[in-house]
């Protein structure tokens, strides 16, 4: 979680969000996830259907996500949601949701072939209310933020896969 979620809070979070969450991420007190993928939309970040509607001082989130790494055990989730569904990619925003927020359900743990130590799950949001201060960066900039951070995330995952493959090859040769 420190390679994937922490950079979003570090780069786009307010000073208050950084002070509240980054120490908890570093200490391991909180487990985090980022909720992008949706049933029916896959990883098409412009086609996200989850919405976050501003209601006074809160955003009200509705929608669902699937194949979310760390989703089952996460205490804190970055949710990719449409704050302006008519604006396409420019209507996408990122919001922090704590797992104990009413209306948030972590669903079931999904079965996987590999990486069994890392959970993957569905997430459901039904009238989940979060303070508007939980918005990362500016409303409507979420897609741009994702495009900025995803290359580093993908590189981190690729390096881990390559290191695992090299280790497996070496263990095989040694055997």
What is each PLM-predicted segment?
Residues 50-53:
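A structural signal for short hydrophobic beta-strand segments in well-ordered beta-sheet cores
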Residues 40-43, 67-70, 84-86, 112-119:
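Short Gly/Pro-enriched turn/cap motifs at secondary-structure boundaries
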Residues 104-175:
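Glycine-rich beta->alpha junctions and the first turn(s) of the following alpha-helix
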Residues 62-106:
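A short core secondary-structure module
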Residues 28-36:
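A short, Trp-centered hydrophobic/proline-enriched beta-strand micro-motif
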Residues 21, 48, 64-66, 107-111:
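Short beta-alpha junctions and helix-cap segments that line functional grooves
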Residues 1-29, 69-76, 87-88:
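Internal helix-loop-helix
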Residues 14, 63, 95, 125, ...:
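Residue-level signal for inorganic ion chemistry
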